[in-house]
């Protein structure tokens, strides 16, 4: 068998790839061994006696399948864990994610007009103070706060209406008493005359 090291080197240079990617037709070894220049190698490539092998695929099918299973909680038991809980998911990262979620929600609610800037500021500081464990807790708190504010407003309006009615009644009574007094005075003056 002829030594084709030179031809392989030249072919790799012409094809701009590594020597392991160069395929030479084993049936045409005698013709390939005569090629001793780049020009001759180009001719062999054109004729299809020398070919660049395709890139090997490194399939991600199995790893995708494993990741899908891990999302469902498989393969994550005690026996599969190497690092501490803090190393696997740092508490600082958990805290940052939670704060970003809560602050994004507060911003969205403020911009859409669901909460005013005062309630936004109060809830922002409460979120910073670790009051809300998750997004749902914050949403429920906002709903409760709004319901409480509406109830307080309704009670205040009712009290104001009650006060206004009582004041109007007092004024009517005072007016009636004044009129009665005037009538008595006029009646007394008539009697005296």
Swiss-Prot record:
In this UniProt entry, which cysteines form S-S bonds? none
- Write one Pfam family the protein is assigned to: Ribosomal_L19e
> Where in the cell?
Cytoplasm
GO CC, sorted alphabetically, is: cytosol; cytosolic large ribosomal subunit; preribosome
GO annotations under biological process? cytoplasmic translation
Keywords annotated in UniProt:
Cytoplasm, Ribonucleoprotein, Ribosomal protein
Q: Does the keyword Cytoplasm apply?
A: yes
Ranges annotated as biased composition (Basic residues): 164-174
**Which GO molecular function terms does the record list?**
RNA binding; structural constituent of ribosome
Tell whether Disulfide bond is among the UniProt keywords.
no
Q: Where is this region: Disordered?
A: 156-179
InterPro entries according to UniProt: 60S_ribosomal_eL19_sf, Ribosomal_eL19, Ribosomal_eL19_dom, Ribosomal_eL19_dom1, Ribosomal_eL19_euk
- PANTHER family named in the record: 60S RIBOSOMAL PROTEIN L19
Protein family per UniProt = Belongs to the eukaryotic ribosomal protein eL19 family.
Complex and partners? Component of the large ribosomal subunit (LSU). Mature yeast ribosomes consist of a small (40S) and a large (60S) subunit. The 40S small subunit contains 1 molecule of ribosomal RNA (18S rRNA) and at least 33 different proteins. The large 60S subunit contains 3 rRNA molecules (25S, 5.8S and 5S rRNA) and at least 46 different proteins. eL19 lies in close proximity to the binding site for eukaryotic initiation factor eIF4G.
Question: Its biological function?
Answer: Component of the ribosome, a large ribonucleoprotein complex responsible for the synthesis of proteins in the cell. The small ribosomal subunit (SSU) binds messenger RNAs (mRNAs) and translates the encoded message by selecting cognate aminoacyl-transfer RNA (tRNA) molecules. The large subunit (LSU) contains the ribosomal catalytic site termed the peptidyl transferase center (PTC), which catalyzes the formation of peptide bonds, thereby polymerizing the amino acids delivered by tRNAs into a polypeptide chain.
Q: Which NCBIfam families does the record match to this protein? A: PRK08570.1
Q: What else is known?
A: There are 2 genes for eL19 in S.pombe.
Would you tell me the protein name for this molecule?
Large ribosomal subunit protein eL19A
Biological classification of the source: Eukaryota, Fungi, Dikarya, Ascomycota, Taphrinomycotina
């Amino acid at each position: 068998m002829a030594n084709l090291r030179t031809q392989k080197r030249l072919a790799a240079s012409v094809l701009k790839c590594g020597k392991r990617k160069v395929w030479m037709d084993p049936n045409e070894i005698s013709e390939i061994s005569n090629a001793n220049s780049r020009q001759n190698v180009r001719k062999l490539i054109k004729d299809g006696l020398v070919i660049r092998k395709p890139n090997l695929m490194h399939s991600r099918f199995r790893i995708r399948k494993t990741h899908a299973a891990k999302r469902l909680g498989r393969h994550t038991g005690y026996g599969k864990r190497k690092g501490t809980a803090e190393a696997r998911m740092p508490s600082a990262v958990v805290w940052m994610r939670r704060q970003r979620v809560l602050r994004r929600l507060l911003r969205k609610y403020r911009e859409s007009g669901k909460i005013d800037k005062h309630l936004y500021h109060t809830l922002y500081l409460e979120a910073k103070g670790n009051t809300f464990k998750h997004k749902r807790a914050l949403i429920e708190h906002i709903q409760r706060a709004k319901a409480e504010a509406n109830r307080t407003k309704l009670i205040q309006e009712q009290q104001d209406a009650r006060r206004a009615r009582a004041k109007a009644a007092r004024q009517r009574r005072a007016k009636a008493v004044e009129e009665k007094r005037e009538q008595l005075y006029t009646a007394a003056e008539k009697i005296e005359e």
